[in-house]
């Protein structure tokens, strides 16, 4: 059983491809095996469909906020909602979501999922900074078409299990709000390089609440540190979250550590339950 972590892009290119970390776990140690890069959505879709066994963490939202869906009178079951959403253009998504936000007061423009606060994630309806609404629009249909299982959302091939991951959740636990990446070359500073080294050091020591130690070769360590965009490191963070989920499943949790949650919205793997 492989573990995968995916740093996704809704518009991949040779300059900024989709990055997939592949590894495996044993006795609390997570070993990185390889980093794969896909510069088109079609190439990534073909890889997803290959007959292989994996548990994966994908850095893209798997659902929309119920408040938004109900306001728009879209289907409130996950599958028909995603099918409806996939049929829209990006321009239609932007215009629809902008109109929703424009009608709401400052400080409450966006609707949120229940998982957003404990995970510290952006609302899945954001179309800019970051454009996670487009990531959902591009990525979830690929997972659906590939016939993978999405725990608490879609039951399909049990040998390929996809979970919504968020590298920022784990990164903040390890180094706080220190920035460790940037796509802007002018912001790819020595301070961010040091932060990537610190993040990897804590991962390799296993000093996280997930109880896992990352194992890297020297070459792999250098690759992750040298990628100033942080995409390779984010893929590895997602892989570690997938390893935690796999461990929960091995211990008897049929839902890979995901709590009972809104079956329209989904949940980010390893995000804590909100305080009562």
Positions of the model-derived regions?
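RNase H-like (RuvC/DEDD) metal-dependent nuclease/polynucleotide-processing core
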Residues: 1-4, 8-276
């Amino acid at each position: 059983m492989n573990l995968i972590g995916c740093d996704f892009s809704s518009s991949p290119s040779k300059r900024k491809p989709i990055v997939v970390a592949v590894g495996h776990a044993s006795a609390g140690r997570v070993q990185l095996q390889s980093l794969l890069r896909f510069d088109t959505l079609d190439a990534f879709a073909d890889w997803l469909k290959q007959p292989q066994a994996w548990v994966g963490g994908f850095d893209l939202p798997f659902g929309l906020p119920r408040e938004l869906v109900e306001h728009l009178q879209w289907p409130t079951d996950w599958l028909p909602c995603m099918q409806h959403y996939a049929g829209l253009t990006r321009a239609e998504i932007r215009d629809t979501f902008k109109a929703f936000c424009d009608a709401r007061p400052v400080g409450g423009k966006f609707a949120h999922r229940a998982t957003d606060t404990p995970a510290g994630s952006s609302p899945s309806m954001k179309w800019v900074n970051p454009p996670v609404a487009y990531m959902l629009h591009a990525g979830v249909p690929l997972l659906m078409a590939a016939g993978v299982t999405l725990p608490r959302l879609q039951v399909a091939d049990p040998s390929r299990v996809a979970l919504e991951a968020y590298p920022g959740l784990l990164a903040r636990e390890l180094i706080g709000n220190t920035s460790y990446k940037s796509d802007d070359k002018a912001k790819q500073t020595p301070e961010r390089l040091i932060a990537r080294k610190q993040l990897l050091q804590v991962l390799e020591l296993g000093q996280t609440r997930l109880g896992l130690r990352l194992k890297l070769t020297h070459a792999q360590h250098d690759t992750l540190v040298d990628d100033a965009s942080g995409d390779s490191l984010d893929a590895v963070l997602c892989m570690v979250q997938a390893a935690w989920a796999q461990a929960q499943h091995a211990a008897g949790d049929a839902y890979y550590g995901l709590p009972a949650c809104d079956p329209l919205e989904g949940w980010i793997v390893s995000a804590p339950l909100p305080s009562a």
